[in-house]
């Protein structure tokens, strides 16, 4: 899809036009112009009940007096002063669905005239593009019959005042980069585990170096990790025939070459059967999504390189598999982590933290400004927060606040969970420094508390995306979250 911003007189538009109308007969500014241009055509439709302005109604008009447009899409938006971000998203989705059914190739949109509380035209345009791209998304790589690309809308033009052109163009630039990052994160996550193994994940990371000359990629195999004493990470991989691989993606574009990097660490379990503590068979296929943390870090790094933000950022994709085998690690094993701390394994299905603890220790060598890990870590987080908010745990209040601000800006929502010393009590072991689980209560928090033991040398935040990384049912598939949140965080950091 090609997006642009122009300022064209309504009477001169000869393609397709999208106009907003509201309940109680209220019209957007350009809808008023259209009504005057067409000698009250829209007013008459409202009077006879053809146009209600209710959200969800889209009326298609053709052959309108004094108007060159092929079609006019009259979009009902509900109460003018009560439109929420969620409703705005639904309005965009319904509009795009209707347009695609007409096979229109170009539209000129005035929906950016919709006013939302505390949002400006930059946000309206950016959010619209991200919504449109998400609506277009198809993952048909492994289907014998592909989606018919001829049905896809080709050009989407935002009609904005001349003085707002630069603002609109920046919004388009940001939105397209983020939307591509989300798409690639979804593509990797939706890939089946017989294709997307740790080696495939590493190959995807290496492809980023071809996308941008600002990126360098190093891949560590099991031999290199063993030399670094990453025995906790390696234990998880023991039951798999596929070698564990950790990809380190370095993006350097800060004016000060010595500026400390921001580090993003993504959990990359390309399949998690639970190991010896085997998961139930029901929905086990969804455990290909246990690498969504790594996929989202990949997506963020792609968006970052596309935007060429003036930052130093390092993305780590911690890839491996957790499978049952005669060589698998066992409940009762005691592992020595890269940090030197020992961990008693009480459940092999609490493996993500065993991988991440070594990855979090590894990134100390970069002397980071801050570190954020992203992981589908706990079912307990899904129980606590459902599928709308990612769980946020942080040792640094300012970092947590910045992430929550980015979540609010993008509607890629997160909710901060507590992290106090009491939770460490649940991780005590009679035989090692730590246990890898903390019992029944507060599982999302105790998982974060476990990781906190390996992050004492830098500001750290943890995003548990177990509830937000993918959808089930008829809409089954990866969401690409939290690419939007993290990219916005980096945009804010670059200012």
Swiss-Prot record:
InterPro entries: Leucine_aapep/pepB (IPR011356), Macro_dom-like (IPR043472), Peptidase_M17_C (IPR000819), Peptidase_M17_leu_NH2_pept (IPR023042), Peptidase_M17_N (IPR008283)
Positions annotated to bind Mn(2+) 1: 272, 349, 351
Lineage: Bacteria, Pseudomonadati, Pseudomonadota, Gammaproteobacteria, Pasteurellales
Positions contributing to Mn(2+) 2 binding: 267, 272, 290, 351
HAMAP family from the UniProt entry: Cytosol_peptidase_M17
EC class of the enzyme, as a word: hydrolase
Family: Belongs to the peptidase M17 family.
GO process terms (BP): proteolysis
Gene giving rise to this polypeptide: pepA
Cellular component aspect of the GO annotation: cytoplasm
NCBIfam families in the cross-refs: PRK00913.1-2, PRK00913.1-4
CDD domains membership: Peptidase_M17 (cd00433)
UniProt entry keywords in alphabetical sequence: Aminopeptidase, Cytoplasm, Hydrolase, Manganese, Metal-binding, Protease
Location of the active site: 279, 353
Entry keyword annotation includes Methyltransferase: no
Name of the protein described by the UniProt record: Probable cytosol aminopeptidase
Cofactor: binding details: Binds 2 manganese ions per subunit.
GO MF terms held by the record: manganese ion binding; metalloaminopeptidase activity
């Amino acid at each position: 899809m090609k997006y642009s911003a122009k300022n064209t007189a309504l009477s001169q538009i000869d393609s397709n036009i999208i106009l907003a109308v509201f309940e109680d007969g209220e019209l957007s500014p350009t809808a008023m112009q259209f009504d005057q241009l067409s000698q009250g055509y829209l007013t008459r439709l409202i009077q006879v009940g053809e146009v209600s302005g209710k959200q969800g109604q889209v009326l298609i008009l053709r052959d309108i007096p004094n108007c060159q447009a092929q079609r006019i899409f009259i979009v009902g938006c509900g109460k003018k002063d009560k439109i929420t971000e969620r409703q705005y998203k639904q309005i965009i989705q319904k509009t795009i669905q209707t347009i695609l059914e007409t096979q229109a190739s170009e539209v000129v949109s005035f929906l950016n005239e919709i006013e939302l509380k505390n949002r400006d035209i930059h946000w309206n345009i950016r959010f619209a593009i991200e919504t449109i791209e998400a609506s277009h998304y198809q993952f048909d790589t492994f289907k014998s019959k592909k989606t018919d690309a001829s049905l896809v809308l080709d050009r989407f033009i935002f009609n904005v005042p001349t003085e707002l052109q630069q603002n609109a163009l920046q919004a388009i630039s940001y939105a397209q980069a983020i939307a591509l990052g989300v798409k690639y994160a979804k593509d990797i996550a939706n890939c089946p585990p017989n294709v997307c193994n740790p080696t495939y994940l590493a190959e995807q990371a290496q492809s980023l170096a071809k996308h941008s000359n600002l990126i360098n990629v190093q891949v560590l195999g099991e031999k290199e990790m063993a030399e670094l004493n990453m025995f906790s990470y390696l234990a998880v991989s023991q039951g798999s025939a596929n070698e564990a691989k950790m990809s380190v993606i370095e993006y350097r574009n800060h004016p000060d070459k010595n500026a400390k990097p921001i580090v993003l660490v993504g959990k990359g379990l390309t399949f998690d059967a639970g190991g010896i503590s085997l998961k139930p068979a029901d929905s086990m296929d969804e455990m290909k999504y246990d690498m969504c943390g790594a996929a989202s870090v990949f997506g963020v790094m792609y968006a970052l390189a596309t935007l060429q933000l003036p930052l130093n950022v390092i993305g780590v994709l911690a890839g491996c598999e957790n499978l049952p085998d005669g060589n698998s690690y066992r409940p009762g094993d005691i592992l020595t982590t890269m940090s030197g701390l020992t961990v008693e394994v009480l459940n092999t299905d609490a493996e993500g933290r065993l991988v991440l603890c070594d990855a979090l220790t590894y990134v100390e060598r970069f002397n980071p400004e801050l570190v954020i890990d992203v992981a589908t870590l706990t079912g307990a987080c899904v129980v606590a927060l459902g599928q709308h908010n990612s769980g946020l745990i942080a040792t640094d209040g300012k970092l947590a606040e910045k992430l929550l601000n980015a979540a609010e800006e993008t509607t890629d929502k997160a909710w901060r969970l507590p992290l106090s010393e009491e939770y460490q009590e649940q991780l005590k072991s009679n035989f090692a420094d730590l246990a890898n689980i903390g019992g029944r209560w507060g599982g999302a928090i105790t998982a974060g508390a476990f990781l906190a033991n390996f992050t004492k040398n830098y500001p750290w935040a943890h995003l548990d995306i177990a509830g937000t990384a993918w959808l089930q049912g008829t809409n089954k598939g990866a969401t690409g979250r939290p690419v939007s949140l993290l990219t916005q965080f980096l945009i804010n950091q670059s200012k």
